[in-house]
């Protein structure tokens, strides 16, 4: 008898709509591959009952908090249900941009200079030291919530007087916010599937940066796979991504986002342990370049579940 698979989709995070689309695509791909799969939305269904509902494995197609942050992974482990993607610790670290950066920096990997602020510090008023640290980053900067995905709450700041509004927006989404030196790009993303590093993708948004609209709504964002890098650059990028991935303890499948700055140096942006799987998504694009159909991709991700 084949395993009965729960595809978790939707959920309650800011990325619910994206997750519903990802989950629907994953479900169709698994079924096409002969897998006995069913959609389960944690917003509608008590996921603590998955085992009693007869499920033997879980494909996590949730994005953001409550699905990608280690909490769900811990629950599934306590229930003894194998699931796709990274474990508890790696999921929690990867969704947290600040702690990812601290670990990468500690491992000697390149990250953009940044200043981290808490909501309490912001509400109290920034100290002269903090203001000096922010000023030292120069302009423009990018302001982002530490634990939000899909560029939610993120904004580019080109003038000093716009910083407060950008921080206010970011603090609507998290208790910790990063102010990062702006990197000129281009942006690349590299997908990982088991032990395999898939071909890199170069991203060219039509707007200021690769924001929510560029990721999920715009048809003007351009993607290049292969990315057009020289063989030595591609090898360097893949080696960097593998180090970043293993430093966080990630496994299964996912994506690392990287920026190439004007100095010719790659800088790590963030890790995604449950990336989008929509029509605009990048892991399926990289898999296609590697000769893998969408159905083959999702079946392979499921095979890696433990």
Swiss-Prot record:
Principal place of residence: cytoplasm
InterPro entries: ATP-grasp, ATP_grasp_subdomain_1, D-Ala_lig_Van_CS, D_ala_D_ala, Dala_Dala_lig_C, Dala_Dala_lig_N, PreATP-grasp_dom_sf
Residues that, per the record, bind Mg(2+) 2: 270, 272
Cofactor: Mg(2+); Mn(2+)
GO BP of this protein: cell wall organization; peptidoglycan biosynthetic process; regulation of cell shape
EC top class named in words: ligase
EC number: 6.3.2.4
Subcellular location: Cytoplasm
Biological pathway: Cell wall biogenesis; peptidoglycan biosynthesis
Chain ranges of the ATP-grasp domain: 101-303
Cofactor-binding details, from the entry: Binds 2 magnesium or manganese ions per subunit.
Catalytic reaction list: 2 D-alanine + ATP = D-alanyl-D-alanine + ADP + phosphate + H(+)
Intrachain S-S bonds: none
Annotated binding of ATP, by residue: 134-189
PROSITE patterns the record matches: ATP_GRASP (PS50975), DALA_DALA_LIGASE_1 (PS00843), DALA_DALA_LIGASE_2 (PS00844)
Residues bound to Mg(2+) 1: 257, 270
GO MF: ATP binding; D-alanine-D-alanine ligase activity; metal ion binding
Role noted for this protein: Cell wall formation.
Family the UniProt entry places it in: Belongs to the D-alanine--D-alanine ligase family.
Name this polypeptide is given: D-alanine--D-alanine ligase B
Gene name of the encoded protein: ddlB
């Amino acid at each position: 008898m084949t395993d009965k698979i729960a595809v978790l989709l939707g959920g309650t995070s800011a990325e619910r709509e994206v997750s519903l689309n990802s989950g629907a695509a994953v479900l169709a791909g698994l079924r096409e591959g002969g897998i006995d799969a069913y959609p389960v939305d944690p917003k509608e269904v008590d996921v603590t009952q998955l085992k009693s509902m007869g499920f033997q494995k879980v494909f996590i197609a949730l994005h953001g908090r409550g699905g990608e942050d280690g909490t769900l992974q811990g629950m599934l482990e306590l229930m003894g249900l194998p699931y796709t993607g990274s474990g508890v610790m790696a999921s929690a670290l990867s969704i947290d941009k600040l702690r990812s950066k601290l670990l990468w920096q500690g491992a000697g990997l390149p990250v953009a200079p940044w200043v981290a602020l808490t909501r309490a510090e912001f509400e109290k008023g920034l100290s002269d030291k903090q203001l000096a640290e922010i000023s030292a980053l120069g302009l423009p900067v990018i302001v982002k919530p530490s634990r939000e995905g899909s560029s939610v709450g993120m904004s580019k700041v080109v003038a000093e007087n716009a910083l407060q509004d950008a921080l206010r927006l970011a603090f609507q989404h998290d208790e910790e916010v990063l102010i990062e030196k702006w990197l000129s790009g281009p942006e690349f993303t590299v997908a990982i599937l088991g032990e395999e590093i898939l071909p890199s993708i170069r991203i060219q948004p039509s707007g200021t940066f690769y924001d929510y609209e560029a990721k999920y709504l715009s048809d003007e964002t351009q993607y290049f796979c292969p990315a057009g890098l020289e063989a030595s650059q591609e090898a360097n990028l893949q080696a960097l991504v593998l180090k970043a991935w293993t430093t966080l303890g990630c496994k299964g499948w996912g994506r690392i986002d990287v920026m190439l700055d004007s100095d010719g140096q790659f800088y790590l942006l963030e890790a995604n342990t449950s990336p989008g799987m929509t029509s605009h998504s990048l892991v399926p694009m990289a898999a296609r370049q590697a000769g893998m159909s969408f159905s083959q991709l999702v079946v392979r991700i499921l095979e890696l579940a433990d």
